Swiss-Prot record:
Swiss-Prot/TrEMBL keywords: Coiled coil, mRNA processing, mRNA splicing, Nucleus, Phosphoprotein
Compositionally biased residues, Acidic residues: 182-214
Modified residues (Phosphoserine): 101, 285, 294, 331, 335, 547
Basic residues bias spans: 265-283, 411-443, 481-492, 659-674
Encoding gene per record: CLASRP
Top-rank lineage group of the source organism: Eukaryota
Recorded GO CC terms: nucleoplasm
The protein, known as: CLK4-associating serine/arginine rich protein
Compartments where located: Nucleus
C-alpha cells in the first residue's frame, strides 16, 4: 500500500510539474506572437464577377453600363456609381473667417496628429510613398519583423566582451562597427536609427524617439507637421505624451506580472517585499491623528495651605452677599509655628466678619476654646494633629452654612451642615479598660434625636444631629485638655468641626443633617467606668467598625505613633488611600472568584454525574432491546426449524426445544448469526 501511494504521489507530482511547465511554455508562446491590435485587421480583395449568369454579366460590363473613372480605362465603374460625380475634385480653400471654437481646434489638431503621424515621420525620414507601400506589402506577406524583447536585449548587452567573428572573410562583424559609431551620427541619419537591420526598406512602424532628437531635428519635425494641419510644436509634444503613456502601460504590465508571480498562499513574504520595494522611494505623510497636537493644560495651582492638607472642599450653599475664600485648619492650639501659619492663612483669606484673628501666643499649650478661635469657619477639608495616644482618620463630606461672630465659638452659633463621612475607628489608650456605654444625645434647634452606642467611657460635649457610633476604646485616665498633646489628624469636609480626641479611632460614619445645631454640644453616656474625655462634635451616623485586620493595614501606612512629639503626623496620601481601596476590592474580588470557581466545579461535577447516569440508562435500554431482538430471532428460527423437521415429536414442548436450541453452538445454526 505504501509503495502504491508513493507511486501515485510521484505520478501526481509529475503531472503538476508538467502542467506548470506547459503553462509557462504556453504563456511564452502567446507573449511571443502577441502583436499590435492594429495589425489584426487585414483587407484582401480580388476581381470577381458580381453576376453568375454570363449574359447578365456581359450586359452589366458593357460600355452602356460601365464607364471609366476619371478617364482611366483600367478602372471602370458603373454609371450609377456615386464615384461618377467625383470626376473633378476641387482644391480646398479654407474660409477667411474661422468659426470653430478653441476646443474644436484642439480636437482637430489631435485628430490630424492621429491621421498623419506616419506621413510626418516618413517625410522626416525621407521615405518615399513607394517604399512605404512596398514595406506594407512585405508585412502583409511575411508579417512584421520580430523585434528582440527586453530580456534578449539585456542578455546581448551583458555579452559585451564577445566579438562577432565571421569565418568566411576573417573580419569582425559589422555589429561592432555600428556599436562604435558616435551617437551624433546615429541621430542625424533617421533611417539608420529607425531600422538597423534593413537600410533599404526601413520599418515605418518604428516611431521617432523624441529623447534622442536634438533641437534642429525637433524643429524640423514640427515644421513637417504644420503642413498636415498641426500647430507648431504639437507633433513633438504629442509624441512625447504617447511615449510617456506607453511607459506607464509597460510599468503597469510589469507590476501585474510581478503580482501574478507572487500570487498564492505561500508567497506572502514576497508580496510584502514587493510592496516595500514599491513604497521605498515614496515619502509617506503621517496619519491625521499623529499630526494633531494634544491640548495643553496649565498646571493646577494650589495654595500652600491646600497643598499641606491635600484635600478639596466644595461649598453647596455659599453665604449670600460675599464669596467665601477656602482656608484650611492647620492647628488646634499647638506650637507657635502652627499657630502662626493658621493666623497667616486667616489674615490672607479675609473672610472674618467679627474680630480680627487672635495673635499667636508665644507660650506653651493653650486651652481648647482659645485654640479653636484661631480656626476659620469654612467649607474645607481639615487636616489636624493627633496626640501620642490617639490618631483618627475620617473622610467627611459636608456642605455647611455657618455664621461666625467674634473670635470664639459660641453656643448660639448655628451650623447648617449636610455631611457624609466615612471613617474607621479603633481606639487604644494607656488604661486598657473595655466598657460599653449607651448615651442619648439631643440636638438643639429642632434637630432629630440620635442614639449613640459607644464602648468608650467618655463624656462627649456638643449638640449635634443624629449620631450613631460604635467604637472600642481602651481609655486612659489622663488626658490633656488642649494644647500640644491633643491633636486630631483627620481629613474631613466639615465646616464646623473642632475636635479634641484622646482615642485612636477609625470609625466608619455617615450622617446627614438639615437642622441648625450648636457646634458645641454635650452628651451624657452611661458607662461602666467613668472617665471624662472631650470628643469631636460632628454630625455622624456611624457604621459598624471595620475588622482589626483592616485597622492594622491602615496603621502600617502611618508613621510610628509611639513618639511623643508635638509635631503633626503626616496623613495618608490619596495614592495610599487608593492603594488600600484597591487592595480591599481585590481581596473581595478574589474571594468572590474563588467561591464562583468552587460553585462552578461543583456544578460541573453534578452535570458529569448526570451525564454518566444518562449514559448508563441508555446503555441499559440498548442492551434490553438487543436481548429482545435476539429472543425474537431465536423464536422465529425455532418456528421455521420445527416446520422443516420431518418427524416433529409431540412430546417436545416449546420450552424443551428452546432450551435445546440454546445449548447448541452457534456454528451449528447457519440461519442464526449474531
Amino acid at each position: 500500500m505504501w509503495h502504491e501511494a508513493r507511486k501515485h504521489e510521484r505520478k501526481l507530482r509529475g503531472m503538476m510539474v508538467d502542467y506548470k511547465k506547459r503553462a509557462e511554455r504556453r504563456r511564452e508562446y502567446y507573449e511571443k506572437i502577441k502583436k499590435d491590435p492594429a495589425q489584426f485587421l487585414q483587407v484582401h480583395g480580388r476581381a470577381c464577377k458580381v453576376h453568375l449568369d454570363s449574359a447578365v454579366a456581359l450586359a452589366a460590363e458593357s460600355p452602356v453600363n460601365m464607364m471609366p473613372w476619371q478617364g482611366d480605362t483600367n478602372n471602370m465603374i458603373d454609371r450609377f456609381d456615386v464615384r461618377a460625380h467625383l470626376d473633378h475634385i476641387p482644391d480646398y480653400t479654407p474660409p477667411l473667417l474661422t468659426t470653430i471654437s478653441p476646443e474644436q481646434e484642439s480636437d482637430e489638431r489631435k485628430c490630424n496628429y492621429e491621421r498623419y503621424r506616419g506621413l510626418v515621420q516618413n517625410d522626416f525620414a525621407g521615405i518615399s510613398e513607394e517604399q512605404c507601400l512596398y514595406q506594407i506589402y512585405i508585412d502583409e506577406l511575411y508579417g512584421g519583423l520580430q523585434r528582440p524583447s527586453e530580456d534578449e536585449k539585456k542578455k546581448l548587452a551583458e555579452k559585451k566582451a564577445s566579438i562577432g567573428y565571421t569565418y568566411e572573410d576573417s573580419t569582425v562583424a559589422e555589429v561592432e562597427k555600428a556599436a562604435e559609431k558616435p551617437e551624433e551620427e546615429e541621430s542625424a541619419a533617421e533611417e539608420e536609427s529607425n531600422s538597423d537591420e534593413d537600410e533599404v526598406i526601413p520599418d515605418i512602424d518604428v516611431e521617432v524617439d523624441v529623447d534622442e532628437l536634438n533641437q534642429e531635428q525637433v524643429a524640423d519635425l514640427n515644421k513637417q507637421a504644420t503642413t498636415y494641419g498641426m500647430a507648431d510644436g504639437d507633433f513633438v509634444r504629442m509624441l512625447r505624451k504617447d511615449k510617456e503613456e506607453a511607459e506607464a502601460i509597460k510599468h503597469a504590465k510589469a507590476l501585474e506580472e510581478e503580482k501574478a508571480m507572487y500570487s498564492g498562499r505561500r508567497s506572502r513574504r514576497q508580496r510584502r517585499e514587493f510592496r516595500e520595494k514599491r513604497l521605498r522611494g515614496r515619502k509617506i505623510s503621517p496619519p491625521s491623528y499623529a499630526r494633531r497636537d494634544s491640548p495643553t493644560y496649565d498646571p493646577y495651582k494650589r495654595s500652600p495651605s491646600e497643598s499641606s492638607s491635600e484635600s478639596r472642599s466644595r461649598s453647596r450653599s455659599p453665604t449670600p452677599g460675599r464669596e467665601e475664600k477656602i482656608t484650611f485648619i492647620t492647628s488646634f492650639g499647638g506650637s507657635d509655628e502652627e499657630a502662626a501659619a493658621a493666623a497667616a492663612a486667616a489674615a490672607a483669606s479675609g473672610v472674618t466678619t467679627g474680630k480680627p484673628p487672635a495673635p499667636p501666643q508665644p507660650g506653651g499649650p493653650a486651652p481648647g476654646r482659645n485654640a479653636s478661635a484661631r480656626r476659620r469657619s469654612s467649607s474645607s477639608s481639615s487636616s489636624s494633629s493627633a496626640s501620642r495616644t490617639s490618631s483618627s482618620r475620617s473622610s467627611s463630606r459636608s456642605s455647611s452654612r455657618s455664621r461666625r461672630g467674634g473670635g470664639y465659638y459660641r453656643s448660639g452659633r448655628h451650623a447648617r451642615s449636610r455631611s457624609r463621612s466615612w471613617s474607621r475607628s479603633r481606639s487604644r489608650s494607656r488604661r486598657y479598660s473595655r466598657s460599653r456605654s449607651r448615651g442619648r444625645r439631643h440636638s438643639g434647634g429642632g434637630s432629630r434625636d440620635g442614639h449613640r452606642y459607644s464602648r468608650s467611657p467618655a463624656r462627649r460635649g456638643g449638640y449635634g444631629p443624629r449620631r450613631r457610633s460604635r467604637s472600642r476604646s481602651h481609655s486612659g485616665d489622663r488626658y490633656r485638655r488642649g494644647g500640644r498633646g491633643l491633636r486630631h489628624h483627620s481629613s474631613s469636609r466639615s465646616r464646623s468641626s473642632w475636635s479634641l480626641s484622646p482615642s485612636r479611632s477609625r470609625s466608619l460614619t455617615r450622617s446627614r443633617s438639615h437642622s441648625p445645631s450648636p457646634s458645641q454640644s454635650r452628651s451624657r453616656s452611661r458607662s461602666r467606668s467613668q472617665s471624662p474625655s472631650p470628643s469631636p462634635a460632628r454630625e455622624k451616623l456611624t457604621r459598624p467598625a471595620a475588622s482589626p485586620a483592616v485597622g492594622e493595614k491602615l496603621k502600617k501606612t502611618e508613621p510610628a505613633a509611639g513618639k511623643e512629639t508635638g509635631a503633626a503626623k503626616p496623613k495618608l496620601t490619596p495614592q495610599e488611600k487608593l492603594k488600600l481601596r484597591m487592595q480591599k476590592a481585590l481581596n473581595r474580588q478574589f474571594k468572590a472568584d474563588k467561591k464562583a470557581a468552587q460553585e462552578k466545579m461543583i456544578q460541573q461535577e453534578h452535570e458529569r454525574q448526570e451525564r454518566e447516569d444518562e449514559l448508563r440508562a441508555m446503555a441499559r435500554k440498548i442492551r434490553m432491546k438487543e436481548r429482545e431482538r435476539r429472543e425474537k430471532e431465536r423464536e422465529e428460527w425455532e418456528r421455521q426449524y420445527s416446520r422443516q423437521s420431518r418427524s416433529p415429536s409431540p412430546r417436545y414442548s416449546r420450552e424443551y426445544s428452546s432450551s435445546r436450541r440454546r445449548s447448541r453452538s452457534r456454528s451449528r445454526s447457519p440461519h442464526y448469526r449474531h
